[in-house]
Design a protein with these regions (language model features):
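PLP-dependent aminotransferase-like
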Residues: 70-158, 165
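Conserved PLP cofactor-binding pocket of PLP-dependent enzymes
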Residues: 215-223, 265-269, 306-372
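Conserved PLP-binding active-site segment of the aspartate aminotransferase-like
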Residues: 280-283, 289-299, 319-339, 371-382
Length: 401
């Protein structure tokens, strides 16, 4: 994902406006900041881009998940279903909320399988987190329909799919809330940072207060006199991050256009290559063009194909062996090793769920990932670079497939 690839004068100009005021904190200092509220402006423009009413900036995509879970009322002992192919932060945020993550299978979108999600629902299930992995939407319509039927909250983890859409609506905007990441390897970056979006005012207010020690942000009084109705924590974004985010958000339409152009030729080649199957897009789905993901006939061919193209200088990922994105490889989660005594929240005091995490509990996910190759798409790809990638892929296909 591009993020860090385009950093320059736009970002520098925005940050300098913050330095000119001397106010790096997002709240207070009305006179000194001279009308410069970078985080607030970033939130407003990000909400507009995604077609929602509200956005709350936070310190990371990981904390965005935690804040959103708190805002949605997830509590200790609740079960939250999510997919076994995701960055580990999705599971960590559920555990941080005191809830129990229930792993579910993926399908040929490389995202949550709606049918397995439905099978995993129990009376303790309170939410589902579909993750739009590697720039492409999950089958979000089906997931939302199942969730509504069972009275569950839908939290879209959109860290890797900013700009993707389903039926003309941005992913992240379709569920009860959506979260985004702005770390160095996301579509836009603030170095570190995240966002929670929602169309529900009460969810937004709870997120806003929880992310700022419970402050109710009453404009009629000074910050020191603001009220609070519950305990929160500090997940505030700084004005410098907000400034960089504004500049990056301004670039986003061009980023998506360039990514699409760079992706197209590679994708078309693979779509017509014998033995190759592109990942599926749900009906009405448009991806964010950050990757090309494809399946090979079996795991051995995938491993050989990956070895051949990477040895020829093509950047590619074989996620079956990835230590941070596949449930199968998280030995600390499999052993329920948390930082708290008694392995909270899995201890009997809080948890009625007797779940045994095993490395073989998601066979369908393992089967898909063992056959999957992922090609990151750089903003800086030249025509010559694209032609080189296509040539290497074509050669590997002729030799191995």
């Amino acid at each position: 994902m591009p993020g860090y690839e385009w950093i320059g004068d736009k970002e520098r100009d925005q940050v300098n406006q913050v330095f000119d005021t001397g106010i790096l904190f997002r709240y207070e200092f009305k006179e000194e900041r001279k009308g410069v509220y970078k985080v607030r402006e970033f939130e407003e423009k990000f909400a507009t881009f995604n077609g929602v009413g509200y956005a709350q900036a936070v310190t990371s995509g990981s904390t965005a998940l935690k804040v959103a879970l708190a805002a949605l009322g997830i509590k200790p002992g609740d079960e939250v279903i999510t997919q076994g192919f995701t960055f580990i932060a999705t599971f960590e945020a559920i555990i941080e909320a005191g809830a129990i993550p229930i792993p579910a299978e993926i399908d040929d979108t490389l995202n949550l399988d709606p049918y397995d999600f439905e099978k995993k629902i129990t009376p303790r299930t309170k939410a589902v987190i579909p993750v739009h992995m590697l720039g492409s939407p999950a089958r979000i319509r089906e997931i939302i329909e199942i969730a509504k039927k069972n009275g569950l909250k839908v939290l879209e983890d959109t860290a890797q799919a900013l700009g993707a859409s389903v039926d003309g609506r941005r992913v992240g905007s379709l569920g009860d809330a959506g979260t985004f990441s702005f770390d160095f390897y996301k579509t836009i970056t603030t170095g570190e940072g995240g966002m929670v979006i929602t169309n529900d005012k009460d969810t937004y207010i709870r997120a806003s207060e929880y992310a700022d020690h419970g402050h109710d942000h009453n404009p009629a009084v000074g910050r020191a006199l603001e009220g609070r109705s519950f305990l929160g924590f500090n997940y505030r974004m700084t004005e410098m991050q907000g400034a960089v985010g504004l500049a990056q958000l301004e670039r986003l339409p061009e980023i998506l256009d360039v990514q699409k152009k760079n992706q197209e030729k590679i994708r078309n080649l693979l779509a017509n290559m014998k033995g190759v199957q592109l990942r599926s897009l749900p009906a009405g789905g448009v991806d964010s063009h950050t990757h090309v993901c494809f399946f090979l006939p079996d795991s051995q061919k995938a491993a050989d194909f990956h070895k051949k193209i990477t040895s020829a200088g093509v950047s590619a990922i074989y996620f079956k062996n990835n230590l941070w994105h596949f449930f199968h490889n998280w030995e600390h989660l499999l052993s329920k090793s948390t930082a708290w005594p008694g392995s909270f929240p899995f201890c009997e005091t809080f948890c009625d769920t007797d779940i045994d995490y095993t490395s073989d509990m998601l066979p369908k996910t393992e089967q898909y990932l063992s056959r999957t190759i992922v090609l990151p798409i750089s903003l800086k790809l030249t025509e010559a670079g694209i032609d080189k990638i296509c040539g290497v892929l074509e050669s590997a296909g002729k030799t191995l497939l």
